[in-house]
């Protein structure tokens, strides 16, 4: 089951591999952007992909959307997403009373107006500000425009260990891989980055018989050369 204000799509079980991403100190290059009308392939500089605003949009023209997903109805509940300048916060509860073996709560940040794709294929690293008070691991997914891949949960993911305090983590694009159940046609990180519509972050840890609070934040997202 999945609840969102966007069209319904299937959601994937978490990957087994967990990436220990490097926490970056915020630097002066964080404010750099590619010139208007260009894409990441044309710019060697760091590029800001999304800066959450207090109204749920991003400064770059995208939007942040929260949703929940579960194997069985009633095992996950999401609260309204809260926003402040630079940060989106997702909260809720995962409680597999009905037997779900997978499920979670997610924030999806669309990067451009109308869900248009951008080319971040020249980037080597996704820098993303994250925090989690409810789980030490968050799943980050690169999402593209292919509906079949999106609905099957076969865009690539990286599992990132995070702290309760908001920090910027450097996640190598090469570390994003498709879930194990996806076929050979599922894209890896570089291919997904070349046609990127959204970045999805999820707390997708389910423990049988355990009720758990979810509380995580997503901040600025950047592509680094």
Locate each region found by the language model:
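Beta-rich carbohydrate-recognition modules and glycan-binding surfaces
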Residues: 30-225
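C-terminal motif of bacterial Sec signal peptides marking the signal peptidase cleavage site
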Residues: 26-28
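Bacterial N-terminal signal peptides that target proteins for export
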Residues: 3-18
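Residue-level signal for mature regions of secreted extracellular proteins and peptides
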Residues: 22-23, 147
């Amino acid at each position: 089951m999945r609840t969102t204000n966007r069209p319904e799509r299937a959601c994937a079980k978490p990957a087994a591999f967990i990436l220990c991403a490097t926490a970056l100190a915020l630097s002066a290059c964080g404010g750099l952007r590619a010139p208007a009308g260009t894409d990441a392939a044309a710019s060697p500089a760091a590029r800001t992909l999304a800066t959450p605003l207090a109204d749920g949009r991003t400064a770059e023209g995208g939007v942040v959307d929260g949703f929940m997903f579960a194997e069985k109805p009633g095992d996950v509940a999401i609260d309204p997403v809260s926003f402040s300048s630079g940060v989106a916060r997702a909260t809720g509860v995962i409680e597999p009373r009905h037997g779900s073996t997978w499920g979670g709560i997610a924030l999806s940040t669309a990067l451009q107006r109308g869900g248009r794709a951008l080319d971040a294929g020249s980037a080597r690293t996704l820098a993303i500000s994250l925090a989690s008070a409810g789980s030490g691991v968050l799943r980050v997914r690169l999402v593209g425009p292919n509906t079949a891949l999106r609905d099957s949960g076969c865009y690539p993911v990286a599992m990132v260990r995070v702290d309760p305090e908001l920090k910027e983590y450097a996640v190598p694009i090469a570390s994003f891989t498709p879930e194990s159940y996806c076929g050979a046609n599922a894209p890896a990180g570089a291919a997904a980055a070349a046609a990127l519509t959204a970045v999805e972050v999820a707390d997708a840890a389910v423990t049988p018989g355990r009720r758990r609070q979810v509380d995580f934040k997503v901040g600025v997202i950047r592509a680094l050369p």
